[in-house]
């Protein structure tokens, strides 16, 4: 299980990303519309003003139950080994084990 501080840090990043999302999106649209290079540099400077952790690339998906950062399935929000355990225990509706 991941440390609680890492999980809380990720939640803080998600809140920051939601807070600055509209500002980033509008600035990016502005950059594409402005023809002069000097204006683009000014807008680019505005894009760098919010905190680093507000960037969507800083987000990392984590397992819903354990907080594990690797091997996550987007459809379920679980890591691979937890997903396998839950499917074997019939806790996920619609998920079946393959057999051939």
From Swiss-Prot:
Coiled-coil residues: none
GO annotation (BP), single: translation
KW RNA-binding (keyword) present: yes
UniProt cross-references to Pfam families, sorted A to Z: Ribosomal_S14
Localization of this protein: Plastid, Chloroplast
InterPro entries: Ribosomal_uS14 (IPR001209), Ribosomal_uS14_bac/plastid (IPR023036), Ribosomal_uS14_CS (IPR018271)
SUPFAM superfamilies: Glucocorticoid receptor-like (DNA-binding domain) (SSF57716)
Keywords: Chloroplast, Plastid, Ribonucleoprotein, Ribosomal protein, RNA-binding, rRNA-binding
Gene Ontology CC terms, in alphabetical order: chloroplast; ribonucleoprotein complex; ribosome
Subunit structure: Part of the 30S ribosomal subunit.
Role description: Binds 16S rRNA, required for the assembly of 30S particles.
PANTHER family, per the entry: 30S RIBOSOMAL PROTEIN S14 (PTHR19836), SMALL RIBOSOMAL SUBUNIT PROTEIN US14M (PTHR19836:SF19)
Name of the protein in its database record: Small ribosomal subunit protein uS14c
Organism: Manihot esculenta (Cassava)
């Amino acid at each position: 299980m991941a440390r609680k501080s890492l999980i809380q840090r990720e939640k803080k990043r998600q809140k920051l990303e939601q807070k600055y999302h509209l500002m980033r999106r509008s600035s990016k649209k502005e950059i594409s519309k402005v023809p002069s290079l000097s204006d683009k540099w000014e807008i680019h400077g505005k894009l760098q003003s919010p905190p680093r952790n507000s960037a969507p690339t800083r987000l990392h998906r984590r397992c819903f139950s354990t907080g594990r950062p690797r091997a996550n399935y987007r459809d379920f929000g679980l890591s691979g080994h937890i997903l396998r355990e839950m499917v074997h225990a019939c806790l996920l509706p619609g998920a079946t084990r393959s057999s051939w």
